[in-house]
Amino acid sequence: MIKLEVCCYSVDCALTAERAGADRIELCASPSEGGLTPSYGSLRLARDRVSVPVHPIIRPRGGDFCYGAVDFDVIKHDIAQIRDMGFAGVVVGMLDEEGHIDLQRMREVMRLSGNMAVTFHRAFDMCQNPMVALSQLTQLGVARILTSGQQQNAELGLPLLRDLLQASQGPVIMAGAGVRLSNLHKFVDIGIQELHSSSGHAVPSTMRYRKAGVTMCSDSEFDEFSHYCVDGEMVEAMKNSLALVDPLVQSA
C-alpha cells in the first residue's frame, strides 16, 4: 500500500490529517522556517490524541544542517524525550562542514533513538553526494530518507528519486516537497511507495480587531492574521487517488 505522510504544524492539523486518512504524521513547528522541533505541549497532546503514527521532527533552529556543540546537545535531549514519550519514530538529519553526512553524530542519534524508526530529513537534499549519503545512511540503519531528489521540488527531482529507488538496499525513499494531487501519479509511476505532503492552505484568523503598523515578524509583509493549516479535503482526495492506483501498481 502506498503511504501518505502529512506534515503538520500543530496538533489541530494532525487531527485533521488523521480524520482525512493520513497514514502517518510528521509533527513540526514553525512552517516559515521549514519545520522545527515541536513544543512539549504539542508532543504530549499529539501522543495522547492522535492514533496514527506520529514522527516529530528534531531541528533546533532554521538554516543549514551543520550544528555546533550546543545545538547537538539540544538535539540529543529532544530525541531522548521523544523516545521516552513513546513515539514510533523521529525525523532528524545533520551534515558536516563539507556537506557530507555527519557520521559520528548520526551514530549517536541512532543509539539514542532506540527502537524508534529514524527518518533522515531533507538535509539529504543539501548533501554533496547523494549516492554516497544513501550508502552511509543504509549502514547506519536509517529507516527512510525524505527527499525532493535534491531539487526545489520533488517533481523536478524525479530523475534522482528514480536512481535512489533503484540503488537503495534498505531505507525507504520518501518523496517530499511539492507533492500534490496533480502530480501524485508521477511518483507512483517510478515506484515510490511513500509520499510526504503538507497539503496545506492559509486559514484567516478569527480576530476582528487588527492592530495596524505593528508586527511580531521581522518580515513586515508576512500575513500574521492567517494560519497555515492542513486541508483535510485535499488529504482525503490524495488518499482516494492513491487507493485507485495502488492495485494497478501491485499487479504490474
UniProtKB/Swiss-Prot annotation:
It holds the Pfam family CutC. This is PF03932 family protein CutC. Belongs to the CutC family. GO terms for cellular component: cytoplasm. The keyword Cytoplasm applies. Signal peptide: none annotated. One of its GO terms (molecular function) is copper ion binding. It comes from Serratia proteamaculans (strain 568). It is found in: Cytoplasm. Keywords: Cytoplasm. SUPFAM superfamilies: CutC-like (SSF110395). The keyword Coiled coil does not apply. InterPro entries: CutC-like, CutC-like_dom_sf. Disulfide bonds: none annotated.
